[in-house]
C-alpha cells in the first residue's frame, strides 16, 4: 500500500475578483511572488515575507 502524506499549511487559497476587469481566479494568501490577473495583467497579490498583500476583492476562502 502506498502511503500519502498531507501537510497542513498555514496559508489558505482565496478566490479573488480583479477590480479592473472582473475576472475571478484562485490565489494563495502567502504567495512568494507577484500574482497578476490572467486577463488584464493587473497585480492581484504582492508578497510581503509572510501573508501577502491582496489588491483584489476576496470572494471566498477555499478549504
Curated annotation (Swiss-Prot):
Cofactor note: Binds 1 zinc ion per subunit.
Cofactors (names): Zn(2+)
Residues given in the record as Zn(2+) binding sites: 18, 21, 37, 40
Family annotation (SUPFAM superfamilies): Zn-binding ribosomal proteins
Alphabetical GO biological process terms: translation
Chain ranges of zinc fingers (C4-type): 18-40
An example molecular function term from Gene Ontology annotations: zinc ion binding
Keyword Zinc applies: yes
PROSITE patterns named among the record's database cross-references: RIBOSOMAL_S27E
Keywords tagged on the record: Metal-binding, Ribonucleoprotein, Ribosomal protein, Zinc, Zinc-finger
Family named by the database record: Belongs to the eukaryotic ribosomal protein eS27 family.
UniProt-recorded name of the protein: Small ribosomal subunit protein eS27
Organism expressing this protein natively: Methanothermobacter thermautotrophicus (strain ATCC 29096 / DSM 1053 / JCM 10044 / NBRC 100330 / Delta H)
Primary gene name: rps27e
